Amino acid sequence: MVVVQKIQEMKEIAKKLKKEGKSIGFVPTMGYLHEGHLSLVRLSKQQNDITIMSIFVNPIQFGPNEDYDRYPRDFERDKSLAEKEGVDYIFYPSVEEMYPEDFKTVVSVKKITEIMCGKSRPGHFDGVATVVLKLFNIVNPDRAYFGQKDAQQLAVIKQMVKDLNLDVEIVPCPIVREQDGLAMSSRNVYLSEEERKSATVLYRALNLAKEMIEKGQKDVSSIKRAMEEMILKEKYTKIDYIEFVNNDTFEIISKVEGKVLIALAVFVGKARLIDNIVVEAK
């Protein structure tokens, strides 16, 4: 496995691989790898000749009072996990390499970024779209792998790829969960033992919504109320949002019809956790 830190070098490697007729699978991460990331790597290995992972904690997708400085980082640990899974190249650039002083461009996807995480983290998805487009241009992948846990991020990237005619296939991958249902996340390390117990309520609330829908409840506000009640019963919790959107258009709905994405963000202690499920109303 090769670690590459310079953009030019990464571009040259990608060019050479393409010349040799090799397909490239790309797994963009912010590091502090967990089983969710590794499941993306495994799928990439199945579908491509070469797998490239990027590890870059992207400063422009964090707001001024967010956790950029304390976001967990452990490159040596990440390196050994990636190597074990058979990653071929890690692209590990510095902030200066990605954003030199004269950097002036922002990629901004409209409308679908105005709700949910986009609403509570202004500018976040501009930062995501900008870094992902840069990474696509550097790595030139045939396929790129993203977890369904960040459902809105996935929608934003798909939209950008479609609108800008990018030649990369976006492969969504299922959420990987701990045994008690908590979605795997690098931010779970922020949780104390007690908070960790409370954190299972995100998935429980999503399942409560699913059960209500399966029993015929179609009114979003009634389902939301039940979810809120369940979440706020737990210690250390504060709800950022609970949103029901059409799974294809990402438009907010008030009545459950067809395929619905139910997404939430909840603070458990200091950690802001997100989760979602897709439910099909009969």
From Swiss-Prot:
Where is this protein localized, as stated in its record?
Answer: Cytoplasm
Which residues are responsible for catalysis? H37
**Reaction(s) catalysed (UniProt annotation):** (R)-pantoate + beta-alanine + ATP = (R)-pantothenate + AMP + diphosphate + H(+)
Q: Which family does it belong to?
A: Belongs to the pantothenate synthetase family.
Q: What does this protein do?
A: Catalyzes the condensation of pantoate with beta-alanine in an ATP-dependent reaction via a pantoyl-adenylate intermediate.
Add the further remark from the entry.
Answer: The reaction proceeds by a bi uni uni bi ping pong mechanism.
> Can you name this protein?
Pantothenate synthetase
